């Protein structure tokens, strides 16, 4: 099997993956700020790094996968006040909702899922170390800030030069800062903030800045220097740039070897945003589409490419996934173990080892499905299920998927008992030699998105199309 190569944002190139400890991978991914339901952009991040950790395990690595939860933040505080509920009540509720969405999408839980509020002492310890090392200062307004010009390598991840960054582009001007580009490590508490929004510290009551949360949790759980750090493309700057400055400023060690960033989600070729009114939660999408269809829709696009969300693309994903399940419908796979020397498995592995190239891996699944359709071979069916399983796909009994309503069928299609009643009426028409009526029922069902297949012995099976 070829070596795994990962596109490293830091190097701006694909690099052969060499873990710090042979056979072990330590990976941290920036998770979700829990003040609302997860949206399609979150779904992409969750699925992408689920695929990454699945593949790392599949090729034999012992993986420690950490994905954090931000459960203290200005948006969280505002939403809790608006709702008249405590911060903990709000965050617990949306953490539960996030877990429900993950389960629906077939996402395996990370090995460790730390909440920011569980690591306040570690954050304060890192801030104090940064102050001792000359990277942090307490401003006149009580906030503790990071002095970006003290860190010589600032900009190495994003490629941005401090001299080219203008105050006000991404940070608001603040007279208390020594430099407008400095960012907050510890926010001084305000008098009108609710209970649970601040902690005691040598700097006074306050709460951590967003960036220090991930540095402290990553270093605490995975060590000062670990293998992979991931997140959405929008986090590359300033969040991940600031994480590097904090962590390396505090420890004097390289923070992360490989930086991975998944691409944006677009809606009809425009960036998804609430202001454009093209913003969809995972729950809204799952009301209309089967969760495995949504997962497949995400999987079949390379993780670094833009993902264009539209009903047309989801309908196409459903049709494509239906083709894969249909290939398995009448073939019982054998029970042998996956053999990486099999040609299809080799092509699949080569694709996944080429920076997790899921479009090519999925193409291999369709090659297999075509061969299964032609040969009805049990070993090929087994390979199809096994390789798809590494992507979190084709885990259901084929007929259960094929007869399940989703998309347009879910919104207004026939229920299973209605379909069975129509099939019974068609059987009765055929027995009465009223073939015109039998054909009419078949055509009517097909127009409603139901395909019939007459089997030897007189039975009829159906599936949604």
From Swiss-Prot:
It comes from the Bacteria. CDD domains: Anticodon_Ia_Cys (cd07963), CysRS_core (cd00672). It is found in: Cytoplasm. GO terms for cellular component: cytosol. Disulfide bonds: none annotated. Its cofactor is Zn(2+). InterPro entries: Cys-tRNA-ligase, Cys-tRNA-synt_Ia_DALR, Cys-tRNA/MSH_ligase, CysS_C, Rossmann-like_a/b/a_fold, tRNA-synt_1_cat_dom, tRNAsynth_Ia_anticodon-bd. Binds 1 zinc ion per subunit. A motif ('HIGH' region) lies at residues 32-42. ATP binds at residue 274. Keywords: Aminoacyl-tRNA synthetase, ATP-binding, Cytoplasm, Ligase, Metal-binding, Nucleotide-binding, Protein biosynthesis, Zinc. GO terms for biological process: cysteinyl-tRNA aminoacylation. Gene3D superfamilies: Cysteine-tRNA ligase, C-terminal anti-codon recognition domain, HUPs. GO terms for molecular function: ATP binding; cysteine-tRNA ligase activity; zinc ion binding. Zn(2+) binds at residues 30, 214, 239, 243. Its EC number is 6.1.1.16. Monomer. This is Cysteine--tRNA ligase.
């Amino acid at each position: 099997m070829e070596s795994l190569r990962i596109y490293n944002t830091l190097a701006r190139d694909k690099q052969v993956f060499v873990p710090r400890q042979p056979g072990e991978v330590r990976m941290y991914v920036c998770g979700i700020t829990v003040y609302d339901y997860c949206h399609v952009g979150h779904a992409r991040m969750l699925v992408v790094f689920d695929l990454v950790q699945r593949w790392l395990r599949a090729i034999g690595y012992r993986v420690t996968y950490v994905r954090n939860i931000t459960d203290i933040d200005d948006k969280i505080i505002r939403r809790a006040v608006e709702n008249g509920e405590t911060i903990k009540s709000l965050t617990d509720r949306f953490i539960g909702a996030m877990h429900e969405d993950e389960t629906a999408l077939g996402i395996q839980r990370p090995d460790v899922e730390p909440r920011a509020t569980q690591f306040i002492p570690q954050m304060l310890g890192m801030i104090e170390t940064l102050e001792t090392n000359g990277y942090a200062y307490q401003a006149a307004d009580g906030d503790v800030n990071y002095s970006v010009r003290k860190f010589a390598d600032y900009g190495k991840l994003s490629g941005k030069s401090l001299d080219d960054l203008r105050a006000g582009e991404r940070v608001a001007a603040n007279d208390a800062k020594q430099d407008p580009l400095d960012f907050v490590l510890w926010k001084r508490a305000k008098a009108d903030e609710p209970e649970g929004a601040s902690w005691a510290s040598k700097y006074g009551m306050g709460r951590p800045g967003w960036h220090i949360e991930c540095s402290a949790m990553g270093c605490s759980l995975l060590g000062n220097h670990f293998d992979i750090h991931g997140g959405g493309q929008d986090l590359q700057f300033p969040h991940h740039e600031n994480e590097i400055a904090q962590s390396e400023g505090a420890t004097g060690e390289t923070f992360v070897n490989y930086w991975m960033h998944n691409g944006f989600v677009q809606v009809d070729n425009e960036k998804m945003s609430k202001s454009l009114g093209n913003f969809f939660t995972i729950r809204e999408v799952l009301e209309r589409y089967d969760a495995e269809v949504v997962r497949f829709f995400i999987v079949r696009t390379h993780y670094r490419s833009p993902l264009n969300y539209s009903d047309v693309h989801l309908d196409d994903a459903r049709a494509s996934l239906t083709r894969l399940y249909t290939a398995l419908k009448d073939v019982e796979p054998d029970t042998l173990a996956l053999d990486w020397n099999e040609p299809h498995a080799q092509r699949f592995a080569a694709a996944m080892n080429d920076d997790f190239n899921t479009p090519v891996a999925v193409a291999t699944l369709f090659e297999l499905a075509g061969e299964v359709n032609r040969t009805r071979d049990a070993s090929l069916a087994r390979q199809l299920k096994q390789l798809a399983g590494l992507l979190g796909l084709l885990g259901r009994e084929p007929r259960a998927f094929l007869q399940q309503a989703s998309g347009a069928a879910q919104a207004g299609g026939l229920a299973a008992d209605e379909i069975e009643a129509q099939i019974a009426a068609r059987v009765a028409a055929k027995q009465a030699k009223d073939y015109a009526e039998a054909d009419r029922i078949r055509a009517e069902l097909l127009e409603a998105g139901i395909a019939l297949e007459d089997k030897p012995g007189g039975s009829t099976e159906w599936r949604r199309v």
